[in-house]
Amino acid sequence: MRFSEGVRRTGPLQSGLCQLEWLAYQTGDPGLFPIFSWVVAVPDGLSDEAVSGAVSALLLRHEVLRTRFDADGDGRPRQSVHESVHVAFPRVEGEDALRRFTETPFDVASEPPIRFGRTARGDLVLVVPHIVADRGGAWILVTDLTELLAAQAQHRAARLSANAPQPVDQARHERESGRARVESSLRHWGNALQDFPVTVFPVSRGRPGADVVRADLESPAAGLALATLRRTLATAPASIFTAAAYTALAIQFHRDRLGLNLTWSFREHPTTRGMVASLFRDMPLIVDLRGRPSFSEVLRRLQKAVLVAGRHMSFDVLEFHERAGRVEAERGAFLPGPESISCTLEGIESVPAEPGGDPRALLADSRVSTSRSNDSWDACNLYLRAYLVEGRLHIDSAIDASVVGDRDSAGLVKLTEAILVHAAASGDLAFGEAESLATDPWRPGARWVGVDGVWVDLDFLTERLQEHPAVHHADVREEHGRLTAYVSADLQPWELRDFLLSTDNGRNAVLSPHRFVIRRTDAATVTGSGVDRPMLAPEGAAEQALKDAVAGANELTDPTMAGTYLTVGGRLHLVPRVLSLLRDSGFEGIGVADLRSPTSLVALAGRLRQRCVRTGGRASHAPHRDRGAPVTGRRATAGDEAGRQPIEGEGKDV
């Protein structure tokens, strides 16, 4: 596939997961999210010309399929719609060929973001990357293509709406008349995220590179229960399932406040409902479960939280993550692997739910299996998904193996099923009754404390501090609901805080104590939270290169090496420029995730490595870094007296 004519129009990129995908592509990665692919049946006897005609109509209907994604002169995401695309229909025969065809990455900056093939029996293989469409948008493509093929076979006009909404128009609206809503949303989340529990799970030592434990439950009982509760509660099935999942997590992990990201499609307006685009974004959703609420009360609280959050979902995704990153640095708590919940429950209305039907009678027909994976898109610390197939509810969980084992993961999906089933059978479910359904819930040990709505392993934090080469002794304690770290070291609080937040804990959460009490070798005692950071000059070639790249890409005057990329004023859409400037100066080794994290520039410089450069047919190395040890008592720039001055601020043209 290739573009065969010039550009028809250009515009910014609409807000959604597509922005994160764009950022990955711009920095050389093959995208953050899986590529969508379907085999679409071609009606028997339909000619190749007719199939090509259906595909032509699909490409003309949806501009996004004729779009390349690159950056404008300011480095911002841009989509350019081409007049036509040269379409190829290669034969895809056999499982290996199909896998290669569907998994080969796209070059979305220079080639069409869609791929068509034909199977041995003549069916169409359709492949699109996530930057083109989320699951809802991709399904629109499949249904439109199916209808266009049927119309060709039946020699009639396709039964599609006259006009399809286009992403460029949505993006222009967001950048112009919709900007006020964007700003309001960002202000809301800047405040709300301050109180967002950093993780569902206990905060303890994670394993970088750990597998993901998967549990897949197929339940006719839960399908009937969901249909029954939908009728009796007159409530959206997605809300019902989400309430059950929150209840199950609260019981399983001994929590009374939970925050998850609800994958939410920005399709509430007629202008976006039928749009093929990547419009999904995460809705941060905090639900308070204090007072041991019944299932119906959890549902009520959840619906209220959704209403509040839903009023503030018009944010720009990259700007949202910038705001969130600054909040994380301020709070001293960071979750590298998201914790998300997703519901796709179309077809629930066809599940029979007659009064008197007892879903408990179907529990014996449930089937659960566990497995493990470790793919590039296994980024979540927790991912819960619910969907319907022929009246059976499928509940899938994917959890970092540092947190749970196979039995625990299976127990979570079974508990969610049980809560739905027993709530449907009884009309409601008391919290104590829901607790009795759990077979092996987690409970804290002696050195665990509840702080800021999460359980924290004090020994984990103590041991992590002791891993710093300049720390002689450390002890983390809970004092009046806050964490205090007593440390013997010639360091400043911000250095210890930065060490904790920059240490690789896999997908699991990291956090810093609220207060440090540091006993120095000169007998002086230094105390503080480590939130305030000094103006710190670069030392060595790597630090200087990183500072110059950050400042040059973002037009910053003098960013402190003690600050994080986002707190010194770095912008996410300019990360590709930062990395390019680093390469030009002879360094590599960090990526988007590093610059999004609450890690200081000085710590990030420690991850840089020399690039191997070819000169005259021989390999030479870029300038080496002067030192690679962790930060151990850095000096501040002149004028920062105590080292604690805070930062401000184929074939056919279509």
What are these regions (language model features)?
Residues M1-G28, S52-E95, A164-V212, Q610-V654:
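Short amphipathic alpha-helices and their capping loops
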Residues R2-F3, P43-L60, R76-E111, L224, ...:
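A short, small/polar-residue-rich loop/turn motif at beta-strand boundaries
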Residues R2-S80, E93-E176, V308-E319:
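Acyl-group handoff/entry surfaces in thioester-processing enzymes
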Residues F3-S4, Q26-I35, S52, E63-V64, ...:
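His-Asp-centered acyl/peptidyl-transfer active-site segments
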Residues E5, P30-A50, A109-V127, R205-H269, ...:
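Gly/Ser/Thr-rich phosphate-binding loops and adjoining beta-strand/alpha-helix segments
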Residues Q26-G31, L59-L98, R115-A120, Q152-R181, ...:
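Small-residue-rich loop/turn and linker elements
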Residues H62, R66, V142, D256-T263, ...:
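Extended, hydrophobic beta-loop-alpha segments that form or line the acyl/peptidyl-thioester binding
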Residues R68-F69, L145, L149-P165, G190-T199, ...:
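A short N-terminal helical cap/helix-turn-helix that marks the beginning
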